[in-house]
């Protein structure tokens, strides 16, 4: 009985810990698990609780841990990490080095938080590890100098993946294509040559429930599966567009891996076989091609929007059948909570949409009137609050 009690306590503790930490798209799926959120919004939108207007340039989303909010931005050509409390009070601001200022300027990859450490991958190609409490830089790596990588057209962009003691990064070098570093000191644990592709703006995904637990990601010309323990390349699938850009983290469920990118390439569904050591194509469809907005899986359906195809789509997970196309709302990023889609248009509107394969069932929408430049940062939901970043402004809305 005592053992059962302690096991239950451990499970509860782990569950609470997971709920209290938000990384890229929550857990990289874009699916949130809040209860009691509003099912419709007032005409002018939900109540704005607070906003902060001095983030500088950038497109990164918020990360949250232990009731503190972390986000990056660029002023001049210097990147800064901002730390807020849940009421929007700025607690700390710390520079971390040069950021991307050559095109679509600003901070890019969302902060990853693990064991009191913060991991930031800059648009200039540095992986930086900071102490979560002091914000001191503990170590950093340069993908060009340390791994033979190259920067890419709009600055490298991914949110580092932490698995146990490893932090995973797409370095993009010929020899050091995907690397696993010790998250404490940055030392190299393993390296994978992959296919020698450059990186392609994709934040990698960890797939734990195969015979060979693995990392799945999209590089410039291939979708890639890598043994998480050893770095051995398990499989690759040729998948390229004319820009070599694949910014959307794949979606995995029950041996199926869904990958998509913009510039007209569309989407492909792969099946992992032989315990994850190989893949086969199940179906492919050209219409669902989000460029930076990603997609979500709810039930047996995938929801997202297009790049060349300026529609919102619903596609059957199993068959690739298109259930609807809708052009009534501008395309952009999507996240989900329960059976509702939160769609953030590149035109600067936020919509609440019922997730149903029957139609794009928009319940409410409101304009995002603060901020600067592109509407590209992905929204975040945490403890009944909807966080929206637009350039130099972070906004918090009451969603519950």
Where would I find each of the regions flagged by the language model?
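Noncatalytic, solvent-exposed loop/strand surfaces
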Residues: 18-400
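Short, Lys/Arg-enriched, disordered terminal segments
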Residues: 1-4, 400
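Intrinsically disordered, low-complexity regions enriched for glutamine and histidine
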Residues: 1, 17-18
């Amino acid at each position: 009985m005592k053992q059962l009690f302690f096991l239950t306590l451990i499970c509860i503790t782990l569950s609470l810990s997971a709920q209290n930490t938000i990384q890229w798209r929550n857990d990289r799926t874009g699916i949130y698990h809040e209860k009691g959120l509003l099912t419709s919004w007032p005409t002018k939108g939900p109540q704005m609780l607070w906003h902060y207007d001095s983030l500088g340039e950038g497109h990164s989303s918020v990360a949250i841990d232990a009731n503190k909010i972390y986000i990056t931005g660029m002023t001049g050509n210097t990147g800064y990490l901002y730390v807020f409390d849940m009421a929007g009070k700025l607690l700390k601001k710390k520079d971390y080095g040069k950021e991307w200022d050559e095109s679509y300027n600003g901070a890019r990859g969302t902060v990853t938080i693990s064991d009191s450490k913060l991991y930031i991958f800059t648009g200039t190609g540095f992986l930086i590890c900071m102490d979560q409490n002091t914000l001191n830089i503990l170590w950093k790596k340069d993908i060009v100098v340390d791994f033979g990588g190259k920067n890419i057209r709009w600055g490298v962009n991914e949110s580092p993946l932490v698995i146990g003691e490893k932090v995973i990064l797409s370095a993009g070098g010929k020899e050091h294509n995907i690397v696993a570093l010790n998250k404490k000191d940055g030392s190299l644990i393993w390296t994978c040559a992959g296919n020698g592709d450059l990186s392609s703006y994709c934040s990698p995904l960890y797939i734990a429930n195969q015979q060979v637990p693995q990392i799945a990601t999209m590089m410039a010309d291939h979708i890639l599966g890598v043994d998480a323990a050893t770095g051995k390349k398990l499989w690759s699938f040729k998948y390229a567009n004319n820009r070599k850009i694949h910014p959307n983290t794949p979606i995995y469920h029950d041996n199926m891996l869904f990958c998509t990118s913009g510039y007209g390439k569309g989407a492909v569904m792969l099946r992992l076989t032989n315990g994850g050591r190989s893949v086969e194509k199940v179906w492919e469809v050209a219409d669902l091609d989000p460029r930076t907005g990603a997609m979500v899986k709810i039930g047996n359906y995938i929801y997202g929007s297009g790049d060349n195809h300026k529609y919102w789509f619903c596609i059957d997970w199993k068959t690739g059948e298109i259930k609807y196309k809708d052009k009534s709302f501008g395309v952009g990023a999507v996240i989900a909570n329960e059976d509702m889609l939160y769609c953030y248009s590149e035109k600067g509107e936020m919509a609440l949409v019922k997730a149903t394969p029957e139609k794009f069932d928009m319940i409410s929408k409101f304009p995002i009137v603060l901020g600067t430049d592109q509407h590209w940062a992905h929204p975040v939901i945490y403890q009944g609050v909807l966080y929206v970043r637009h350039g130099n402004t972070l906004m918090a809305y009451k969603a519950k």
